[in-house]
Regions:
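PAS-associated C-terminal cap
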Residues: 40-50
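Short regulatory alpha-helical coupling segments
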Residues: 53-56, 67-87, 118-126, 144
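Conserved nucleotide-binding and Mg2+-coordinating catalytic segments in signaling enzymes
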Residues: 53-72, 93-107, 115
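A short pre-motif secondary-structure segment
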Residues: 130-133
Length: 214
């Protein structure tokens, strides 16, 4: 038999142990079987497993959910919202003129922009909301149980937070960034999550055509 469990040491440290037990027959038939147990500290192994699991779900650059994990979670929330007829809001945002930022200020500056925008996205989340980077300069928010008026407030707050960002390039130039954002809500007629994504994507590109920063 093999078991894994946690213990708390006398110094307060949490450790993981692997405990293996097996029965060995005694060559001396006058005595019963011998029970052998081996305990091994597997704390480092567990920590590594946890880190690998974390890395499988996040975008390393921005520390937000990666595309695969975001849509896995979004699909579960979509199914729950359909099942229980609860509201669900979906938002897509794209950093305006990001290629120009990279070309003008360099890719390291572009990475910094992505990181700061992701921080803004995480800052507006409620408990249970999901934020992820789903493309180069494209992010998504999923807001379970969120009515349209509240979702609009969250979108406006996110716009304001990003508009406040100020960056300084290596040559001393100061610049800001804006986003174009598309918002949609679950409809009874939506057959799947992709229907919401398509609407949000269309709304986002409409915002870009109408002048961006909206």
């Amino acid at each position: 038999e093999e078991r894994e469990y946690r213990i708390i040491r006398t110094d307060g440290q949490l450790r993981w142990l692997s405990d293996k037990c097996f029965i060995a027959r005694n060559a001396d038939s006058t005595h019963g079987p011998i029970i052998v147990g081996i305990a091994e500290d597997i704390t480092e192994k567990k920590q590594l497993e946890g880190e690998l699991q974390r890395l499988a779900t996040i975008d390393v650059l921005t520390q937000s959910s990666n595309r695969r994990y975001f849509f896995e979670c979004a699909q579960r929330e979509f199914d729950l919202a359909r099942q229980y007829a609860t509201p669900l809001a979906f938002q897509l945002l794209d950093i305006d003129d990001f290629k120009r930022i990279n070309d003008t200020h360099g890719h390291q500056m572009g990475d910094q922009v992505l990181q700061r925008v992701a921080q803004c996205g995480s800052s507006v989340l409620r408990r249970g909301d999901l934020f992820g980077r789903i493309g180069g300069e494209e992010f998504a928010l999923l807001l379970p149980g969120c009515q349209p008026d509240l979702a609009e407030q969250i979108a406006e707050r996110l716009q304001r937070e990003i508009q406040r960002l100020v960056f300084t390039s290596p040559d001393g130039q100061r610049f800001g960034v804006t986003i174009s954002l598309g918002v949609t809500y679950l409809r009874a007629s939506d057959p799947d999550l992709s229907a919401m994504f398509t609407r949000a994507d269309a709304a986002m590109y409409t915002a870009k055509r109408l002048g961006k920063n909206q």
